[in-house]
């Protein structure tokens, strides 16, 4: 069972609405269903807690583990409280009955095992005696065949009985104790099917310490699954990893590759038809015959100029790749994939100190994605999602897709401002971050969040370390061609990003969706 209940937080905040989930005998609560991917804020085991109905307030109930946990809850109505009481009571009763039955079976099996072990010791002693008797007969050289057959028959019978009893002991032990060792937690423990930013790494043989990139796997059920691989190591994926990539579409800078089993779309390194990467395509004439990755004749780089790939040129999806639809419609899926692709920039700045910023950005992406997957045919563009919520009068409701997109575009403006500072030649990363923050997010943050950001600035990397993190191949940042490559890639990336953010700004201004709320 799941639903909203009011939980007593403290004397300052009082009763606050929380989303509760009862699953597997455990009651967990979250800020909202959309925030469930962050993990529960608290939980209580129904089998060991007491359910108390308030004597005065007919909408209130208390869940108590004496001396440990106290959940003071209120329903929105008497009928709703009754439904929760029935569900909680049933869960507690089922778990209690199950535990009682298991304890009873465990006690019986323990007793049976003790009995069998006593029999085993008896047969063991008997075996020792019969072996000694057999030795005596053999040593004495007794020729009475009848006595010899009698001793041998007894020994064989005792051995068979000993082995049979030992087997019974093992069967009892397996039935009684193995399951207890396997299940330290109840088998029905809740496995919450919520949206998570799940990440997995494929077993690719490492070449060097290179930049990590992410590929997005769209799931109809729970959003997007991000698979992290190393950019330069994509060339080994066909032979070294479980993803078999097939080249299907080639243009000047990217190729689209599709895994037929998992519908994984990869845009990045250009591959030959035989599946091998043309590693020298960056060092040779782009129009060299025999290569499948042929750039157009209008290539702005000269034949002898080394073209070094960067983080932005090897993105699996980029804002510069997005083609706007009719009436400047921004395609939802491509936009969200591009947002995911730029998130690793925050890891280059500091995976720990910038974790809250990254979490907020990813959380807003997921909220929009959750809305999108409810009706992919209708919500093909971001504008359609916003207009749908405007018409339903839920655009400014907390945790709506419109609100999530509002904060998402603010976060993207911050990243764009920072990258613009770097492109314009700012060598101090702290200064670049501070300037970008002051122009974008600072006006929407209260003094607490501003203080957190100020602390994060102190841990910002040096310009050299940040640039090194944007390389695909270790040591490329020391080459002169890398700076030109960064300028080239950002000159394509940032204007495309700015254009789409400007479209969203216009949309929000027209419908009065901008908010002055400070967090």
UniProtKB/Swiss-Prot annotation:
Residues 330-473 are annotated as: Glycolipid transfer protein homology domain. One of its GO terms (cellular component) is nucleoplasm. GO terms for biological process: ER to Golgi ceramide transport; lipid transport. It comes from the Eukaryota. The modification Phosphoserine is found at residue 145. Gene3D superfamilies: Glycolipid transfer protein (1.10.3520.10), Pleckstrin-homology domain (PH domain)/Phosphotyrosine-binding domain (PTB) (2.30.29.30). Keywords: Golgi apparatus, Lipid transport, Lipid-binding, Membrane, Phosphoprotein, Transport. It is a peripheral membrane protein. GO terms for molecular function: ceramide binding; glycolipid binding; glycolipid transfer activity; phosphatidylinositol-4-phosphate binding. The modification Phosphothreonine is found at residues 139, 153. SUPFAM superfamilies: Glycolipid transfer protein, GLTP, PH domain-like. It is found in: Golgi apparatus, trans-Golgi network membrane; Membrane. Disulfide bonds: none annotated. Residues 1-93 form the PH domain. InterPro entries: GLTP_sf (IPR036497), Glycolipid_transfer_prot_dom (IPR014830), PH-like_dom_sf (IPR011993), PH_domain (IPR001849). Cargo transport protein that is required for apical transport from the trans-Golgi network (TGN). Transports AQP2 from the trans-Golgi network (TGN) to sites of AQP2 phosphorylation. Mediates the non-vesicular transport of glucosylceramide (GlcCer) from the trans-Golgi network (TGN) to the plasma membrane and plays a pivotal role in the synthesis of complex glycosphingolipids. Binding of both phosphatidylinositol 4-phosphate (PIP) and ARF1 are essential for the GlcCer transfer ability. Homodimer. Interacts with ARF1; the interaction together with phosphatidylinositol 4-phosphate binding is required for FAPP2 GlcCer transfer ability. The PH domain of FAPPS binds the small GTPase ARF1 and phosphatidylinositol-4-phosphate (PtdIns4P) with high selectivity, and is required for recruitment of FAPPs to the trans-Golgi network (TGN). This is Pleckstrin homology domain-containing family A member 8. It comes from Mus musculus.
């Amino acid at each position: 069972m799941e639903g909203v209940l009011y939980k007593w937080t403290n004397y300052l905040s009082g009763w606050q609405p929380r989303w509760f989930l009862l699953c597997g005998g455990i009651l967990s609560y979250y800020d909202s269903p959309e925030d469930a991917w962050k993990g529960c804020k608290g939980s209580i085991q129904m089998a060991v807690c007491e359910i108390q109905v308030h004597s005065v307030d007919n909408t209130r109930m208390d869940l108590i583990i004496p001396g440990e946990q106290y959940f003071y809850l209120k329903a929105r109505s008497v009928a709703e409280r009754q439904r929760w009481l029935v569900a909680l009571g049933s869960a507690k009763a089922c778990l209690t009955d199950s535990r009682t039955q298991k304890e009873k079976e465990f006690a019986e099996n323990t007793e049976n095992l003790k009995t069998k072990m006593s029999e085993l010791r008896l047969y063991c002693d008997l075996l020792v005696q019969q072996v000694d008797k057999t030795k005596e007969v053999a040593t004495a050289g007794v020729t009475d065949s009848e006595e010899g057959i009698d001793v041998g028959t007894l020994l064989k019978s005792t051995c068979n009985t000993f082995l049979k009893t030992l087997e019974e002991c093992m069967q009892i032990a397996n039935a009684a104790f193995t399951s207890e060792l396997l299940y330290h937690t109840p088998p029905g423990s809740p496995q919450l099917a919520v949206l998570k930013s799940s990440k997995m790494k494929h077993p690719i043989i490492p070449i060097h310490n290179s930049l990590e990139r992410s590929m997005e796997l769209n799931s109809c059920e729970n959003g997007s699954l991000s698979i992290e691989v190393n950019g330069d190591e994509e060339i080994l994926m066909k032979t070294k990893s479980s993803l078999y990539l097939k080249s299907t579409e080639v243009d000047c800078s990217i190729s689209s590759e599709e895994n037929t089993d998992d519908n994984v779309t990869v845009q990045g390194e250009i591959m030959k038809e035989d599946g091998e990467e043309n590693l020298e395509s960056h060092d040779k004439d782009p129009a060299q015959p025999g290569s499948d990755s042929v750039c157009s004749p209008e290539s702005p780089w000269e034949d002898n100029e080394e073209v070094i790939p960067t983080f932005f040129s090897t993105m699996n999806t980029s804002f510069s790749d997005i083609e706007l639809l009719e009436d400047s419609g921004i395609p939802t899926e491509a936009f969200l994939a591009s947002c995911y692709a730029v998130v690793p920039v925050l890891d280059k700045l500091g995976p720990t100190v910038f974790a809250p910023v990254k979490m907020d950005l990813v959380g807003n992406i997921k909220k929009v994605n959750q809305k999108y997957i409810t009706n992919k045919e209708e919500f093909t563009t971001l504008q359609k999602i916003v207009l749908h919520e405007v018409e339903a009068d839920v655009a400014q409701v907390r945790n709506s897709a419109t609100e999530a997109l509002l904060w998402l575009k603010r976060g993207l403006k911050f990243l764009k401002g920072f990258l613009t500072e770097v492109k314009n030649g700012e060598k101090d990363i702290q200064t670049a971050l501070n300037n970008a923050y002051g122009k974008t997010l600072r006006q929407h943050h209260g003094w607490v969040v501003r203080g957190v950001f100020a602390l994060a600035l102190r841990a910002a990397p040096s310009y050299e370390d940040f640039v090194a993190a944007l390389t695909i191949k270790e040591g490329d940042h020391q080459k002169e061609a890398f700076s030109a490559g960064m300028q080239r890639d950002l000159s394509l990336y940032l204007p495309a990003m700015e254009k789409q953010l400007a479209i969203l700004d216009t949309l929000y201004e027209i419908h009065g969706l901008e908010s002055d709320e400070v967090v």
